[in-house]
Amino acid sequence: MEVDVLKRVPVREQDPKVRATNFEEVCYGYNKEEAMAEASRCLNCKNAQCMKGCPVSINIPAFVEQVKNGDFTKAYEIISESSALPAVCGRVCPQESQCEGKCIRGFKGDPVSIGKLERFVADTARENLSLIHISEPTR
């Protein structure tokens, strides 16, 4: 997939005529190829400002790097170290004013779609439960 590093990989959405007839999510999210292409736009900054904008301090460069490499299990593990609700946060967290708002890529072009990548990782883990390690109860 050809990637313009200044532009986000577009996210697929329901056609407006179809979505007017249902209550399904409008945004379909990324598929594997789209997620890897979007992740390849990340500059993997040493002093990652995106992490400073994340209220739960997810190691964003590390999980995005794993998405770029196609290791979605590792990406999920990294996100899960800080967030118990990645599928929710990937949908409702105001990324444009938090992590994506601090993304260096956004100074010239579009910031990396961190929220959409988080959503992709969480949805992929949920669809493939074998990717998720569930710890034994502690009590």
Stretch-by-stretch model annotation:
Residues 7-26:
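Short, contiguous pre-domain boundary segments
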Residues 20-37, 59-91, 108-131:
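Ferredoxin-type iron-sulfur electron-transfer modules in oxidoreductases and energy-metabolism complexes
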Residues 40-59, 86-107:
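Local cysteine-cluster metal-coordination motifs and their immediate loop/turn environment
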Residues 130-138:
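Residue-level detector of conserved catalytic or cofactor/ligand-binding positions
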